[in-house]
Amino acid sequence: MERGTIHNKGSFLSNISKNLQREMPQHVERPEWQYRPQDKTLTGLTQDELLEVLRQQCNFIHTDLVETTTDNINETLSQVIEKYGNGEVIAWNDKRFADFGIDLEAHDAFIWDEAKGAENLQVAERANVGITFSDVTLAESGTVVLYADKGKGRSVSLLPATYIAIVPKSTIVPRFTQAAQQMNAMMEDQENFPTCINLITGPSNSADIEMKLVVGVHGPIKATYIVVDDK
């Protein structure tokens, strides 16, 4: 996956400033807010308490949450895949699968390969199960945050009929505030900044003008978060 290059940024911003009848700013000072409730929300909770908040939120977003350990992760994963009817499996090319001892070969999983180009999309389209890790997990909203990059295509969590997120317990944070802070810190190393950041809150949910819930129109029909104790 090639990183994009921004062209004509200066002239674009200069044109905006000109139409606003001002000089183009060379530096932006972030405002100091008097009140920052976002910094305090849920921050006093332990990791176990955050997990409980996440569990409760999953009930509202039609998502199953399963707890397991590194010793039992393969058995748990097999049970979830079987519950979803088995079928073709696609997963990220992510060293964390090996770190956690997850045996993807047991499910004959297709591993996303940048060199295979369009074949990745074709497999993702027909796959029944897509599996990724969660990089940051937001307890308040039940959201998994995925940092896409080489070997970590967006289609793995988008195109299959069902989706499984492996959630290391240590990745659970109170809310998006903490995720944004992490992203700001990552900006210091722009060479390794993710090519895409996706926030996924359970299966695909849509509603028409009559507010009738429709599941699976823009993504997976079902989703499971497997929370695993870190090594």
From Swiss-Prot:
What biological process terms from GO does the record include?
Answer: lactate metabolic process
Superkingdom of this entry's organism? Bacteria
Q: Transmembrane segments in this chain: where? A: none
Which SUPFAM superfamilies did the record assign? NagB/RpiA/CoA transferase-like
Q: List the Pfam families.
A: LUD_dom (PF02589)
What InterPro entries does the database record attribute to this sequence?
FTHF_cligase-like_sf, LUD_dom, LutC, NagB/RpiA_transferase-like
What task does this protein carry out?
A: Is involved in L-lactate degradation and allows cells to grow with lactate as the sole carbon source.
Which protein family is named in the record? Belongs to the LutC/YkgG family.
- State the protein's name: Lactate utilization protein C
Question: What organism does the UniProt record list as the source?
Answer: Macrococcus caseolyticus (strain JCSC5402) (Macrococcoides caseolyticum)
